[in-house]
């Protein structure tokens, strides 16, 4: 009996394995993550941008977002006039619209964008860093 109680105590002390959390509209963390991503996207697409969230999930100190950028009031972004095309010379045929995928990591001080891509023409995040983002990408190859 004593061995069983020790086993139960050990199991209870282990961290629970939780599923990723979908952040609902209006959640403070959702706003914080989108505001962390916004300056990077505005550098590439021009300001201002708003995000339409397809998916935004958090798993502990990691997060993964799939969003589409638009102008205020829902106006579409003309990719031809964006800094990533005009300033950086990115060919339009290599950009599949203002869709963004982004990975985040929470440090002691704040959330940071680890990696993001705008207008990917492939599923670049397939199996991306499964060691750290596996729970967030379980349906995407991890």
Regions found by a protein language model. Give the residues of each.
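Positively charged n-region of N-terminal signal peptides that target proteins for export
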Residues: 1-4
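Short beta-strand edge/turn micro-motifs at domain boundaries
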Residues: 98-134, 140
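N-terminal signal peptide c-region/cleavage motif recognized by signal peptidases
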Residues: 13-17
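Surface-exposed patches in mature extracellular/periplasmic domains of secreted proteins
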Residues: 48-56, 114-116
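N-terminal glycine/threonine-rich, aromatic-flanked beta-hairpin/loop signature
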Residues: 45, 62, 68-70, 132-142
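Short, non-transmembrane alpha-helical segments in secretory-pathway proteins
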Residues: 20-48
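Structured segments of extracytoplasmic/periplasmic soluble domains
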Residues: 36, 40-44, 71-72, 107-110
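Mature extracytoplasmic domains of secretory-pathway proteins
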Residues: 55-106
């Amino acid at each position: 009996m004593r061995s069983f109680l020790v086993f139960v105590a050990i199991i209870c002390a282990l961290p629970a394995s939780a599923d990723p959390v979908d952040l609902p509209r209006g959640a403070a963390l959702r706003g914080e993550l989108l505001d962390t991503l916004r300056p990077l996207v505005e550098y590439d697409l021009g300001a201002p941008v708003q995000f339409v969230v397809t998916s935004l999930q958090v798993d502990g100190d990691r997060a993964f977002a799939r969003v589409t950028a638009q102008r205020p009031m829902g106006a579409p972004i003309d990719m031809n006039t964006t800094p990533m095309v005009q300033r950086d010379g990115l060919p339009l045929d290599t950009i599949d619209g203002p869709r963004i995928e982004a990975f985040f990591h929470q440090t002691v001080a704040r959330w940071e964008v680890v990696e993001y891509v705008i207008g990917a023409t492939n599923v670049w995040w397939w199996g991306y860093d499964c060691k750290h983002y596996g729970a967030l990408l379980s349906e995407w190859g991890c």
